[in-house]
Structures are given as structure tokens and as C-alpha cells.
């Protein structure tokens, strides 16, 4: 507990970039030792390896951060911790089992994270389910099916507490009695958006709300990017349900790809604006999401061979679509074989170019059938 105030101080310290803070931590045992170190010690550590190491260390050139160091104080950090203690907000440092591997693997992650609620065993896989704030009925259906399956497999579901797919992911997880983590772009003094305050509180009953920002920090645009980076780093797998080309979900997905994470995207019609980003992700190296049974470990080549009853169901769907386009719920009444879900039929048939989902929210036959 004594070290927490020093972790917060170093994390919030302005005038010293993250790279420099990490270098100090590599050379000194903890942030308390950094706080009490002399300017000469700090200067020498940060100058080591540079062409000017000797002259800087000898003081022939005043470091740019001299004023920052001479004016250092724990006052701001103590105020933050006081508020955190009042609101049951906890701190994660690189020494914590939930954060040490993530911190070591990604040089751009912050020194500390803050959270409310409870964190599960760090060995349990975490799957991020993200997507458009203005999702389609198709996206909602796929998100619910995927989350239900993932929770059943024992995964923790992570998302961003926003409208649309994020909220669906959190709510579906809770409905399935699973654990969900919400990553937010502000301090934990409020929910973002405010209308999700009740959802935020519900999440903390069994899961956690996590942020890289201290109490009182508001959700400014650049903080959404920081939140997305932490979400991408925390997750083992990221599933993008629907996303436009320029969106926060695309930012998160691309961040995850750069970190070498397993990224999946739902293929959809090129005529559907809400899926322009997910289709682009497939071109950038994401794996195609086919159905909930193939989500984590199967490939497109492993589609099951349809049995007789399954073939009958497909034929019934095709026959129904010949009379006109139908919604997913309307098609569900034609599925006889309940070993497979309606979305599995539709996904397989879409991949076989038998049907397509269009922007009107309905399934259409591909010409010639």
C-alpha cells in the first residue's frame, strides 16, 4: 500500500515521457526510489547510452526536466488515492499478477491501471467483443450468439461500455452469468456514457471496470485511443462484430493486430456501411468469423458436412427466400434441425454464395438459385 502513492505520482508526472519512466524503473527498484533519487542520478540513468552521456552526467548541459524534478510532490497522487479509497477503486502496477505480463509485453501500456470490482484468475482467457455504436439487427444477433458461446466456453468477455455492440456484449455476458470487463476512457468517478451507470455497477458485482485514467479525468478524444490500446493489450482475442472504416473499433482491432493478438471479423455485404471496416480488417490479416463454433480455433475449411435434416433445412430456407427477402427471425421458423443454430445455417450459406445479407436488414437469395 505504501508504494501506491509513488506509483500514482510517477504515472501522473508530467514532463517525463513514458519511455523515460520505464527506463528509470528498469534501473531503480521501485517508484519510491525514483522519487527520492537525486537529479544527478536521474540524469545519468536517462542519458546512459546516448552520445552525450558523459557531458550530461557532469552537468555541462541542463536536462529539460530539471524544473519538473525539483518541483516534484506527492500532493496530486495523495489526492487521487484519497478519492480512490472513498470509491473502492484499486490500482494495478507492473508488480501485480494481473498486469505484469501485459506491462512487459507492450512498451506503450501505462505504468498503472485503475479498476473497480473484482478481477478473475489471470490465466482465464479474455475475449474482446467490440463493434459499432449503431449496430444493425444482424450485428446484434451475431454478438449475442457469439458472447453466449464464448461465456459457455469459460471466457471472460471484455468491451468498452459504449452503446451498441459494447452494451450488448456486457449485458449478454451478465445474462449468461459470465464475467465481463469494461474498459473506459475516463476516471472511475463516472460511467461513460452516463446512461450506462447502472450497467457499470452491475458489471462490478462479478467483473471489473478498468481504466488507465485516474479519478476525475474526463473522457477527452485522445483518451478513447488510450483506452482502446489497453483493451487490445488485455485481450487474448478480439472479435469485431460490425465497424465502419473510421471508428474506434477499427482503432482497437488494428492495435490488437500490431500486438500479435488473435483478431476475428465478421464478413458481410460490401453494400453494408456498418461492415466496411470489418471487411477491411479481413484484408489486413484478421481471421473471418464464421460461426460461434469456429470462433477461436477452427478455420474456414472445417465447416461440418451437412446431414440429411440439415440439407432439408437449407432447402426450406432457399424455398422461402424465393418468395422474397426475410429477416433472420423470419427464417428461423424454417429451420428444422436444431443441432445447428439459424446463424450457423445462414453463415454457411452466405460463405457458399447462396444468400447474402443486405443493408435492408434482410437475407436475399444470390441470383440463379
Model-predicted regions and their roles:
Residues 1-4, 93-369:
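Glycine-biased, small-residue-rich flexible motifs in mid-sequence functional cores and linkers
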Amino acid at each position: 500500500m505504501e508504494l501506491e502513492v509513488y506509483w500514482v505520482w510517477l504515472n501522473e508526472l508530467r514532463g517525463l515521457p513514458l519511455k523515460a519512466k520505464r527506463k528509470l524503473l528498469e534501473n531503480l527498484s521501485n517508484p519510491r526510489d525514483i522519487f527520492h533519487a537525486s537529479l544527478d542520478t536521474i540524469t545519468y540513468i536517462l542519458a546512459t547510452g546516448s552520445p552525450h552521456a558523459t557531458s550530461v552526467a557532469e552537468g555541462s548541459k541542463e536536462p529539460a526536466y530539471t524544473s519538473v524534478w525539483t518541483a516534484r510532490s506527492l500532493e496530486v497522487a495523495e489526492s487521487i488515492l484519497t478519492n480512490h479509497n472513498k470509491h473502492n477503486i484499486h490500482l494495478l502496477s507492473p508488480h501485480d499478477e494481473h498486469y505484469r505480463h501485459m506491462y512487459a509485453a507492450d512498451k506503450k501500456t501505462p505504468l498503472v491501471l485503475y479498476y473497480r470490482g473484482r478481477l478473475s484468475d489471470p490465466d482465464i482467457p479474455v475475449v474482446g467483443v467490440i463493434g459499432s455504436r449503431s449496430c444493425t439487427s444482424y450485428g446484434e444477433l451475431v454478438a449475442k450468439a457469439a458472447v453466449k458461446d464464448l461465456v459457455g466456453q469459460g471466457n471472460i468477455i471484455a468491451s468498452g461500455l459504449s452503446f451498441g455492440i459494447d452494451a450488448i456484449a456486457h449485458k449478454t455476458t451478465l445474462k449468461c452469468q459470465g464475467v465481463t470487463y469494461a474498459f473506459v476512457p475516463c476516471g472511475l468517478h463516472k460511467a461513460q456514457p452516463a446512461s450506462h451507470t447502472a450497467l457499470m455497477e452491475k458489471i462490478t458485482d462479478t467483473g471489473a471496470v478498468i481504466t488507465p485514467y485516474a479519478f476525475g479525468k474526463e473522457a477527452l478524444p485522445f483518451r478513447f485511443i488510450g483506452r482502446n490500446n489497453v483493451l487490445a493489450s488485455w485481450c487474448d482475442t478480439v472479435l469485431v462484430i460490425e465497424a465502419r472504416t473510421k471508428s474506434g473499433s477499427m482503432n482497437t482491432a488494428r492495435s490488437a493486430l500490431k500486438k500479435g493478438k488473435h483478431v476475428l471479423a465478421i464478413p458481410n455485404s460490401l453494400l453494408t456501411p456498418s461492415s466496411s471496416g470489418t471487411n477491411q480488417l479481413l484484408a489486413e490479416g484478421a481471421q473471418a468469423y464464421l460461426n460461434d463454433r469456429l470462433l477461436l480455433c477452427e478455420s474456414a475449411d472445417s465447416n461440418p458436412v451437412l446431414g440429411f435434416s440439415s440439407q432439408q433445412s437449407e432447402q426450406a430456407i432457399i424455398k422461402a427466400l424465393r418468395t422474397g427477402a426475410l429477416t433472420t427471425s423470419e427464417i428461423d421458423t424454417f429451420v428444422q434441425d436444431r443441432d445447428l443454430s439459424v446463424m450457423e445455417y445462414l453463415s454457411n450459406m452466405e460463405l457458399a454464395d447462396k444468400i447474402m445479407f443486405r443493408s435492408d436488414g434482410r437475407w436475399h437469395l444470390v441470383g440463379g438459385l
